[in-house]
Amino acid sequence: DFNAGDVANAPDRPRIVGDAVSHYRKLAHKRPAVAFCVSIADAEKAAERFREAGYRAVAISGESDPFERDRALTGLRDGSLDVVCNCALWVAGVDVPSVSCIILLAPTKSLTKYLQSVGRGLRTHPGKDDLIVLDHVGNVARHGMPTDEREWTLAASVKKRGATERSEVPVKTCQKCFATVAS
């Protein structure tokens, strides 16, 4: 996968996170959201940026006290939190059906990690009609749409698409509304 330190220290990192906050405000304002960040420090900075913009946001990680992690989960469920920023903690094994926005701030070469991250928002929930994915790191272009059909096999003879190869289904992004669709 990408080197987390290199990504977190990239010169344009503050702009990427800032854009995530403005795009959340524009496209998913107040929707329960989970942001996937590259490091614990990155998650803390992202949560701080969301709080500065007036959102109720926290950062959690594997180093967080279990009570803090439970409180974040409860906060998304009961609406007392808007955004939970995490670093590799909620990729799998967490079920918060009310989440209707996923914010991708961590690039990954792993299709599985990408699909599991987006999957945190694909649960059905009363009153939830859709999921908004704010991809600020090119994971959709890298792996395709989460809903793309994929051939899964255990056969060793089938050549699998390499982790760094581009998606077989090209995507394009509207520069006005930032919607990404298969092209």
Predicted regions and their residues:
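A short beta-strand element within the Helicase C-terminal
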Residues: 82-109, 113-120, 130-135
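C-terminal helicase lobe
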Residues: 78, 111-116, 120-183
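A generic secondary-structure signal
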Residues: 22-26, 49, 75, 120, ...
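Conserved helicase ATPase core of P-loop NTP-dependent helicases/translocases
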Residues: 34, 42-92
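Residues at the C-termini of beta-strands that transition into short coil/loop
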Residues: 61-63, 106, 137
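Short, surface-exposed connector motifs at secondary-structure boundaries
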Residues: 25-32, 53-56, 97-100
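Conserved interdomain linker/interface between the two RecA-like ATPase lobes of SF2 helicase motors
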Residues: 1-38, 157, 165-166
